[in-house]
Amino acid sequence: MRYSAFSLLKNALNGNKDWKPAWRKPDPKPAYDVVIIGGGHGLATAYYLAKEHGIRNIAVVEKGWLGSGNIGRNTTAVRSNYLLTENQHFYEASMKLWETMSHDLNYNVMFSQRGVVNLAHNLPQLDVYVRRGNQMRLNGIDCELLNPKQLEKLIPGLDTSASARFPIIGGLMQRSAGTARHDAVVWAYARAADQLGVDIIENCEVTGFIKDGDKVTGVMTTRLDRKSTRL
């Protein structure tokens, strides 16, 4: 089922009787082409393998429930304001994915580009932000170096006085950065991957690997062992 205004209205009128589970609870197959361990980043990996590369016989194995690991315990910040060029290009490409993710996955991940500000409390720290900001602009990434007056106008209530416990002498802002709801991201990728045929196996812990010489051919789990050509 594709989520839409029509489906919301239809289910609102019939007492929410027609909603289907966001993803299946399948029994594991005897073998898979790919087994991915971990239902956090693993869900995105499975989705793009299925969508971009046509690999559909995939299992994502999660020892708990989806979102119970690190993906459900993070700062929710989405940004590309890093110092190194390699990091900037990597995270800026990720930012572009975030901007269309809700549409691409047909699920509201609550991505909000409200901006992020890093505050400088001393001259060495401000110098680091100046260097980072210059590098960002060289790579075409938006950023602004702000003085205390500009910060005060941008963030009412921020204590920029000289008597503040942690005096603020400036800050670096990236307006395109923001936040996303991590639970919604997990559910969105799980639903989208499931619709492409990916099996999501929850409450299934990997306890070891099956090997043929130096080659890994499968995984041992708390729900039987599974063969795989790739891990």
PLM region spans:
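Short hydrophobic core segments
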Residues: 35-37, 61, 226-231
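Glycine-rich FAD pyrophosphate-binding loop
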Residues: 50-72
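N-terminal Rossmann-fold NAD(P) dinucleotide-binding loop
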Residues: 42-43
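Extreme N-terminal leader/targeting segments of oxidoreductases
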Residues: 1-33, 48-56
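A short, glycine/Asx- and small/polar-enriched loop/turn
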Residues: 124, 154-168, 210-218
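Helical element adjacent to the flavin cofactor pocket in flavoenzyme catalytic cores
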Residues: 172-226, 230
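Short loop/edge segments at beta-strand edges and connector loops
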Residues: 62, 147, 202-204
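Dinucleotide-binding Rossmann-like beta1-alpha1 core, especially the glycine-rich loop
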Residues: 75-157
